[in-house]
């Protein structure tokens, strides 16, 4: 009988701990979805052309100066400083890709990388000649997914894990955005992928996005403090009950 009571008390205590931690984590964990503040791409063969404001964002690999790169920036000021970044995902909605014919190739499976920019730029002025520099530190890569998108679907997204890059920005590294490019430029066939932008598209379902999930450490510390307090109170209650039993005997 005493064993059953002890197990019941232990389970009750663990349940209270679980509810406490669950509530605090629910309060402390947040996910925000951010849309771009600037976006553009440029074609190497027309080095002074700017494509800011275009409805597409094109990444291309082909020889004889036909590569294309794209730049995109997000304002992450809505994410508090000194929080723990749990995940950050860049998502681009696929529009269309080249297919295998003549000098064209299907880019499915090709690796596109995202690099952190180290210089400021403007979506309405950036081109191949004045493109900002970048670093491969904490870069992210992803294979081009299969299938064709289109204005009416299906919905096909290409994702990159930018957790480390966003953590750097949140820690004070200047946020100039990122560049997206094929990791093997100057291909013998023309491999090209077009994504939708936040310009000239019907609604936010087409927009590129940066999805950030973060944890506020203050909530964690508060949860630990409450659990510690609960433990002390449980201990005092247990000792008092044991003392009462002893006095009764």
What function would you assign to each model-found segment?
Residues 243-249:
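Cytoplasmic C-terminal tails of single-pass
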Residues 20-21, 228-242:
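Alpha-helical transmembrane segments
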Residues 35-38, 163, 167-224:
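Proprotein-processing/basic-patch segments
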Residues 71-75, 84-95, 115, 157-165, ...:
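Residues within well-ordered beta-strands of beta-sheet-rich folds
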Residues 1-31:
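Hydrophobic secretory-pathway targeting helix
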Residues 44-99:
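A short beta-strand-loop element at or near the start of a globular domain
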Residues 41, 47-48, 97-174:
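Beta-strand-rich interaction/scaffold domains
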Residues 24-58:
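N-terminal leader/pro-regions and domain N-caps
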